[in-house]
């Protein structure tokens, strides 16, 4: 048997014919046939542009998606093509992306997630640091430099909210910021589970002038080369190629021009980022569903047992169609949300009214809640339908199975999303 895939020193478990059919090119073709009808020619053209780059990058760099590959070394190439974020135009740093917005970013995310889900997750964490800088750069040179570094892939970024003793309770932080006579601040405290932190040049950090007082929060841009920034890696076995951090801040001095949100403004800045963060996680989760479905659907059409393809057995085919229908319907929902978000942003000049923003926060939580629950189901069931082929290292299915286990936790747990939605129901009642 000719070996067509060399990922590790372990065996090739899937035969050549099926393995070749499971190529990225064919999986893209399968998804394209599903989505082409809902995309405009311009949207589909951009989607294909990202796909073509991923295919070329995989081939030219002999990417096997093995567990020992350094996904962070890929970032500069993707950044140079404008594929780190398409949520904004970035005219203030002379990028002037076209297209841009929630819809193009969703399509970028989908194409990149099918290329490598762990790489897409790491890229999403950089976007979380990009967004507050985009909103609060105030044309200050160092902030624009950091924004351009991250948007163009010159350096990864991270956002530091979670603390060892403050997970879901993000507004009662223990990390402190003490203002100095020269207008700078000294930061002291600990952060944890911050994606990309050990690899990042730039970090957006939240701290408070008074512990446990959300009204005294501030937001800072940090250069991780500064004295007082200490970071070690937290290893998450589900995503072995993604580096998360545990940061110890010891008298970390932040100059005045790096203060993105003064004391009292940090909480507002934190909440304004919830919509793009949660819809981004939802988009990533639905992308994982499509990735897993593409593997399982192709495999089920080729694998034979009892002298017929396994797709024709109701236990396989009917389950696969159920997962396909659920994924398709949620994709329509996210796509419509992204279109509406882009329309509202254009209508209101990039600043959503407070009441509309609150409504969209609850909608984003709904999608985050539903999509992350679905990816947990879809990725497991697709791997199960593929049997051993869905668990071995010959394909990306094991990556989808692993990463889907953590999406409900990332960016606010399932229970927090339910709490947010319950508060929204309370507000809707009060409006009657």
Please annotate each region the language model reported:
Residues 1-123, 149, 351, 431:
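Amphipathic, small/basic residue-rich leader segments at the start of a protein or domain
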Residues 2-28, 384-432:
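Glycine-rich phosphate/cofactor-binding loops in nucleotide/flavin-utilizing enzymes
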Residues 31-35, 59, 63-72, 94-96, ...:
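Glycine-rich cofactor-pocket loops
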Residues 117-141, 167-170, 181:
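N-terminal glycine-rich flavin-associated loop
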Residues 152-162:
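A short, Trp-centered hydrophobic/proline-enriched beta-strand micro-motif
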Residues 184, 188-230:
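A short core secondary-structure module
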Residues 230-331, 407, 426, 432:
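Glycine-rich beta->alpha junctions and the first turn(s) of the following alpha-helix
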Residues 356-389:
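Charged, glycine-rich active-site and insertion segments that engage polyanionic ligands
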């Amino acid at each position: 048997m000719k070996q067509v895939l060399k990922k590790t020193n372990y065996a090739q478990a899937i035969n050549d014919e099926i393995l070749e059919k499971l190529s990225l090119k064919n999986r893209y073709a399968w998804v394209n046939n599903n989505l082409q009808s809902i995309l405009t020619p311009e949207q589909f053209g951009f989607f294909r542009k990202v796909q073509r780059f991923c295919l070329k990058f995989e081939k030219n760099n002999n990417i096997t998606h093995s567990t020992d590959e350094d996904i962070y070394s890929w970032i500069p190439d993707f950044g140079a093509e404008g594929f780190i974020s398409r949520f904004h135009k970035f005219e203030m740093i002379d990028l002037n992306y076209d297209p841009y917005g929630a819809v193009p970013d969703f399509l970028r995310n989908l194409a990149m997630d099918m290329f490598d889900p762990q790489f897409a997750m790491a890229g999403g964490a950089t976007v979380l640091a990009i967004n507050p800088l985009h909103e609060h750069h105030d044309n200050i040179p160092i902030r624009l430099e950091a924004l351009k570094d991250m948007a163009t892939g010159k350096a990864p970024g991270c956002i530091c909210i979670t603390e060892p003793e403050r997970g879901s309770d993000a507004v009662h932080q223990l990390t402190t910021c003490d203002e100095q006579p020269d207008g700078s601040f000294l930061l002291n405290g600990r952060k944890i589970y911050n994606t990309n932190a050990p690899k990042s040049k730039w970090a957006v950090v939240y701290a408070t002038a008074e512990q446990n007082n959300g009204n005294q929060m501030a937001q800072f841009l940090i250069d991780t080369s500064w004295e007082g920034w200490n970071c070690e890696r937290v290893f998450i076995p589900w995503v072995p190629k993604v580096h998360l951090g545990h940061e110890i801040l010891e008298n970390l001095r932040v100059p005045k021009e790096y203060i993105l949100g003064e004391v009292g403004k940090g909480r507002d800045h934190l909440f304004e980022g919830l919509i793009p963060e949660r819809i981004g996680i939802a988009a990533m989760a639905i992308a994982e569903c499509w990735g897993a479905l593409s593997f399982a659907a192709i495999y089920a059409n080729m694998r034979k047992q009892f002298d017929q393809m396994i797709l024709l057995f109701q236990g396989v085919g009917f389950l696969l169609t159920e997962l396909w229908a659920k994924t398709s319907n949620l994709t329509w929902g996210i796509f419509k949300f992204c279109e509406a978000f882009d329309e509202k942003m254009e209508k209101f000049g990039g600043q959503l009214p407070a009441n509309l923003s609150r409504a969209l926060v609850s909608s984003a939580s709904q999608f985050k809640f539903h999509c992350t629950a679905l990816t947990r189901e879809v990725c497991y069931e697709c791997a199960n339908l593929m049997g051993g082929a869905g668990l071995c290292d010959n394909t990306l299915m094991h990556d989808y199975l692993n990463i889907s286990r953590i999406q409900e936790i990332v960016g606010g747990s399932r229970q927090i999303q339910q709490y947010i939605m319950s508060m929204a129901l309370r507000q809707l009642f009060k409006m009657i």
